[in-house]
A protein has these predicted regions:
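Ferredoxin-reductase
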Residues: 2-90
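SAM/dcSAM-binding transferase cores
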Residues: 274-277, 284-291
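Structural signal for conserved beta-strand scaffold positions within catalytic alpha/beta enzyme cores
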Residues: 17, 65, 184-186, 241, ...
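Short, low-complexity, intrinsically disordered N-terminal peptides in bacterial proteins
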Residues: 1-10, 112-120, 207-210, 265-266, ...
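FNR/FR-type flavoprotein reductase catalytic core
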Residues: 82-246
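Short, surface-exposed secondary-structure boundary micro-motifs
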Residues: 50-52, 99, 262
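Local cysteine-cluster metal-coordination motifs and their immediate loop/turn environment
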Residues: 135, 222-223, 244-280
């Protein structure tokens, strides 16, 4: 299996600020010692405080935004690791290891191809659940700018954001300012439509507001990704899933993040893939998820 990416590094960054963005989440901004090359959206870093007050094992976080040497991470308070990061003060050191993993595919590519060989490439729907929104801000930015391939017109990108309630639609105004269609769904009906994000997609397709044939990117809770995986299999519409998987090392050594592969898919030669190396982004037809 592949080794960790050649551009991965371990370095100390400086915490700059924490900005609340809804519920128990905040955006952590850190500054690396020097400007970093542009990083493909949905790659991640392992983060850990360096003052001895945090768990020894770092935590994986997708890059939310990048501005030269400055990196933003969307942090949700969940346990000791995230709580220690949310207690950082400006100027404190943070250990970063990365960038790690792969990222979203080139959204300007005609692949995966439409079922009709003569048809235009299908629109993309970006399905986010809660903090699963983290890898999508840069994905949209990079697609619009043509950072990795040609630019994608804004009307060909549809961002669908689902959460339990309005408070978990983290940093929603920032996504609305990107200029792509944004649709929301909440389980309690406090913002957008009531229901789950996949139900939102199917409703918008029935109404003709999103084409019947699309290509999907998805990141969110396990049950949401299982539903998107099943939808892709059922409908034949291609999807890429960015898994929110627990990781021990992030570089493929500990074997703590196995993902069962589909024996008919592109990773069929291996019984399991490593989420930190072959992922976190997988084609839906490459892996098996429990339903």
């Amino acid at each position: 299996m592949p080794a960790p990416p050649p551009d991965a590094r371990s370095f100390l960054a400086q915490a700059l600020r924490l900005v609340p963005c809804g519920g128990a989440a905040a955006i952590l901004t850190v500054r690396a010692p020097e400007a970093l090359p542009t990083i493909r959206a949905s790659r991640f870093f392992m983060l850990r405080r360096e003052d001895g007050s945090a768990p020894l094992i770092p935590r994986p976080y997708s890059i939310y935004k990048q501005r030269g040497a400055e990196l933003d991470f969307l942090i949700l308070r969940q346990g000791q690791g995230s709580s220690s990061l949310l207690a950082l003060q400006a100027g404190m050191p943070v250990r970063l290891i990365g960038p790690l993993g792969n990222g979203w595919p080139d959204l300007a590519s005609p692949e995966p191809a439409a079922p009709d060989p003569g048809a235009s490439p299908a629109d993309w729907v970006l399905l986010a659940g809660g903090v699963g929104s983290a890898p999508f801000y840069m994905a949209i930015e990079q697609a619009l700018a043509g950072t990795f391939g040609g630019p994608v017109p804004a009307h060909r990108l549809h961002f669908l954001f689902g959460a339990r309630s309005r408070a978990q639609l983290y940093d929603l105004p920032a996504f609305e300012a990107l200029g792509v269609p944004v649709h929301t769904a909440t389980q309690d009906g406090s913002h957008g439509r009531r229901g789950h994000v996949l139900e939102l997609l199917e409703s918008l397709q029935r109404e003709g507001r999103i084409p019947a044939t699309v290509r999907a990117l998805a990141c969110g809770p396990e049950r949401m990704l299982e539903a998107v995986h099943a939808w892709s299999r059922r409908s034949g519409q291609p999807a890429y899933l960015s898994l929110e998987t627990l990781m021990g090392c992030g570089v493929g050594i500990c074997n703590g993040c196995p993902v069962p592969t589909d024996k008919r898919g592109p990773l069929r030669d291996w019984p399991n893939a490593k989420a930190c190396v072959e992922g976190p982004v997988f084609r839906a037809d490459a892996i098996e998820l429990c339903h």
